Amino acid sequence: MSMLFYTLITAFLIGVQAEPYTDSNVPEGDSVPEAHWTKLQHSLDTALRRARSAPAEPIAARVTGQTRNITVDPKLFKKRRLRSPRVLFSTQPPPTSSDTLDLDFQAHGTISFNRTHRSKRSSTHPVFHMGEFSVCDSVSVWVGDKTTATDIKGKEVTVLGEVNINNSVFKQYFFETKCRAPNPVESGCRGIDSKHWNSYCTTTHTFVKALTTDDKQAAWRFIRIDTACVCVLSRKAARRG
């Protein structure tokens, strides 16, 4: 609104400067040429159109409707800042077999936030060659029943399960990776010298953009999801003889 105000003031000053001076060659009785006023009016109309078309709210304002009937503009999925390789909107469940699980699942009726080429990931991600082992066992799955999550501000929000895109109902999926064992095992991480190190496997998290609701307001928010299983180490205190 302030930009519109300054634009109007500038246009007004231009109009004032265009008025004929009493000591100029233009007779006092003559008016300002009609072409000038036409140009000035055009400038004002352009400023008004820009002010009206400018988004008055953040991107959340483009997500409209009730929590059970959210309609999303498909153009939003082309915005790079909203893309995430771990978020998928689809009318059908993504493949779950170990040889077909792909973050770029692009079957009919699917909209992925990620448009770049990525290698396929198995359900026991990562995959190692013979003789190689991971220090922690992990499992990766597409999660389509997430109802709540913690946003980047630490606040619990409701995750939208379904949205309307081009008059079709799309379900929101998240590709999550976590430790296979829900609790740390006594033996610790695989291959770690337990004589000198304490170790345990734990699930780590990251934040991705997702469609959520909070206080009946639908919006894109960063939410926390499981993304890896890592080994945590701490050196054992040396024993004194």
Swiss-Prot record:
Query: One of this protein's GO BP terms?
Result: negative regulation of type B pancreatic cell apoptotic process
Disulfide bonding pattern of the chain: C136-C201, C179-C229, C189-C231
**Which of UniProt's keywords are assigned here?**
Cleavage on pair of basic residues, Disulfide bond, Endosome, Glycoprotein, Growth factor, Lipid-binding, Metalloenzyme inhibitor, Metalloprotease inhibitor, Protease inhibitor, Secreted, Signal
- Output one GO MF annotation: growth factor activity
Q: Which InterPro entries match?
A: Cystine-knot_cytokine, Nerve_growth_factor-like, Nerve_growth_factor-rel, Nerve_growth_factor_bsu, Nerve_growth_factor_bsu_mml, Nerve_growth_factor_CS
What tissues express this gene product? Detected in the granule and pyramidal cell layer in the hippocampus.
Disulfide bond keyword on record: yes
What is a single Pfam family found in this protein's UniProt entry? Answer: NGF
Query: Residues that bind a 1-acyl-sn-glycero-3-phospho-L-serine, according to the entry?
Result: K209
Name the family: Belongs to the NGF-beta family.
User: What is the annotated role of this protein in its UniProt record?
Assistant: Nerve growth factor is important for the development and maintenance of the sympathetic and sensory nervous systems. Extracellular ligand for the NTRK1 and NGFR receptors, activates cellular signaling cascades to regulate neuronal proliferation, differentiation and survival. The immature NGF precursor (proNGF) functions as a ligand for the heterodimeric receptor formed by SORCS2 and NGFR, and activates cellular signaling cascades that lead to inactivation of RAC1 and/or RAC2, reorganization of the actin cytoskeleton and neuronal growth cone collapse.
What is the designated name of this protein? Beta-nerve growth factor
Q: Which species does the entry assign this protein to? A: Rattus norvegicus (Rat)
Q: Which gene encodes it?
A: Ngf
